[in-house]
Amino acid sequence: MNIFSFYIINNDAPEPWQICYQDSATKIMSGIDKLTGEIFYYETLLLIIVGWVLISAIIKYTKTELSYKYFNHGTLIEILWTCSPAFILIAISFPSFKLLYLMDSIIDSQITIKVLGHQWYWSYEYSDYLDNSGDSISFDSIMIPTDDLEPGQFRLLEVDNRIVLPIHTHIRFICTSSDVIHSFAVPSLGLKIDALPGRLNGISTYVEREGTFYGQCSELCGVYHFGMPIVIEAVRIEKYLEWLNIHLDNTPSS
């Protein structure tokens, strides 16, 4: 590894014993990561303060004959320990309201992708594009078995057909299910939406950098729930157009 390198290696896939988020590729996920870090900091500070008060009180009042050790009611202290957590929760909730609003907002999209959950694989349809026969681009995405993986690929996360998206483009996912409840989730993009049978749910994203992003079904959907990985490959618009041409079969015949 070159310590003088100006390149940043992003973590877009889960790792063993990982306890933090994957690196974000959207502003929404960056906001979620930042908010989580701030809340964790203040929670740690509160834990230290409250723990110190409790331990100090235990040590002090078990070694003294003061009458306060038998004190079992106090209006002021009860108001304080009731109102203080309420104010803290309110202060924490306000920054999250903006993120919740942005996550639920459906922006005018340039590309719409339909997502259909099955037991146990995903189907995708690019309904904005039609091939020479008038059909839209659609394909199934099935997990690659462990025995068929190539060196460097992730177990239980690789699929035979990936979603390919252009960066710096507003994209909308419309999700539903053909059988049971599934959940379409890609942590690096801040995407998580339920796929419900008989109902359409929508979510928008705007990918800011190239990369390969991994996700999974996040709703227990049966015995092979683990076998529903999601792989999204974000590329430059030029590569995306090349991918479209291949799938639309627009190459002139010789």
UniProtKB/Swiss-Prot annotation:
It catalyses: 4 Fe(II)-[cytochrome c] + O2 + 8 H(+)(in) = 4 Fe(III)-[cytochrome c] + 2 H2O + 4 H(+)(out). The keyword Transport applies. It comes from the Eukaryota. The chain crosses the membrane at residues 39-59, 74-94. GO terms for cellular component: mitochondrial inner membrane. GO terms for biological process: ATP synthesis coupled electron transport. The keyword Electron transport applies. Keywords: Copper, Electron transport, Magnesium, Membrane, Metal-binding, Mitochondrion, Mitochondrion inner membrane, Respiratory chain, Translocase, Transmembrane, Transmembrane helix, Transport. It is found in: Mitochondrion inner membrane. It is a multi-pass membrane protein. Cu cation A2 binds at residues 217, 219, 221, 225. Residues 60-73 are mitochondrial matrix. InterPro entries: CcO_II, CcO_II-like_C, CcO_II_C, Copper_CuA, Cupredoxin, Cyt_c_oxidase_su2, Cyt_c_oxidase_su2_TM_dom, Cyt_c_oxidase_su2_TM_sf. Residues 12-38, 95-248 are mitochondrial intermembrane. Gene3D superfamilies: 1.10.287.90, Cupredoxins - blue copper proteins. Mg(2+) binds at residue 219. Its cofactor is Cu cation. Its EC number is 7.1.1.9. Pfam families: COX2, COX2_TM. One of its GO terms (molecular function) is cytochrome-c oxidase activity. Belongs to the cytochrome c oxidase subunit 2 family. Component of the cytochrome c oxidase (complex IV, CIV), a multisubunit enzyme composed of a catalytic core of 3 subunits and several supernumerary subunits. The complex exists as a monomer or a dimer and forms supercomplexes (SCs) in the inner mitochondrial membrane with ubiquinol-cytochrome c oxidoreductase (cytochrome b-c1 complex, complex III, CIII). Component of the cytochrome c oxidase, the last enzyme in the mitochondrial electron transport chain which drives oxidative phosphorylation. The respiratory chain contains 3 multisubunit complexes succinate dehydrogenase (complex II, CII), ubiquinol-cytochrome c oxidoreductase (cytochrome b-c1 complex, complex III, CIII) and cytochrome c oxidase (complex IV, CIV), that cooperate to transfer electrons derived from NADH and succinate to molecular oxygen, creating an electrochemical gradient over the inner membrane that drives transmembrane transport and the ATP synthase. This is Cytochrome c oxidase subunit 2. The gene is cox2.
